[in-house]
Each structure stands twice: as C-alpha cells, then as structure tokens.
Amino acid sequence: MKFGMNLLLWTGAMNDDMIPVVASLKEMGYDGVEVPVFEDNIDLYTQWGSRLQEMGLECTAVTVRGEEDNPISSDPAVRALGVENNKRALDNAAAAGAIRLVGPYHSALGVFSGQGPTEDEWKWGVDS
C-alpha cells in the first residue's frame, strides 16, 4: 500500500513555500503528493515534477471546474471553456509527472440542480 498527501491542505497554488512542506512529508514516509492544478503554467509544473522526482515522491494532481467553466452547462460557450480548461489541466498535470488527475472536473463543483442529470447533461458530460 502507498500513502500520499493532498497539498490542498496547505495551498491552492504551488510555490517555493511548499518545498519544506513536501520535504517534511517525504521524511514522514509518504510515497507521494497530490498537486493542485488550478493555473495554466507548464514551466511551474515541470519544475515541481523535477523536484518531486528528485525527492523520490510520486505525483498525482487535482483540479476542479466551477460554474464559469462547467462542462455540462446548458451554455455552449461555458461547456467549451470547461473542456479547454480540462485539457490545460491534463497538460499541466502531465508536466508535473502526475500519474493521475482527479477532480471533480466532470461538472461544476458545488453546482446542483436538485435532481439527477438530464439527458442533455449526460451527453455533454460524455462529450467533454
């Protein structure tokens, strides 16, 4: 069994202040960390991927979609932005060396209709 820690406990944006935190997690025996991917910055995530690899830590990544980029919105422009932002998140997670990307990114975090998905929402989710 492997153990990892989600860095959202400390930050929503990776920066140099996280270096001692990540080093401490490695010293405690964690096998990996989950990196927040909330910005489009390939260079930043490439740098963090190298750091994590040098420390001997595995990397996973987390991202979310909001109301403004909801992949199952009834607004085609909002859906398109959601799909584009998911692609960017995948690119940034890959730059960090992440072995998986978790969400929720299939729909907007915290946006609820009070009922199950409609046929259109289901289709938009599949298309995204």
Question: How would you describe each model-predicted region?
Answer:
Residues 1-9, 14-29, 97-99:
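Histidine-acidic metal/acid-base catalytic patches
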Residues 5, 25, 33, 52, ...:
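Conserved, mostly hydrophobic/aromatic
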Residues 20-27, 42-63, 88-98:
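Acidic (Asp/Glu)-rich catalytic clusters
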Residues 3-7, 33-35, 59-64, 101-103:
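Hydrophobic faces of well-ordered beta-strands that scaffold small-molecule active sites
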Residues 76-128:
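Active-site acidic/histidine proton-transfer and metal-coordination neighborhood
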Residues 18-20, 47-50, 76, 115-118:
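Short, glycine/charged-enriched secondary-structure capping and boundary segments
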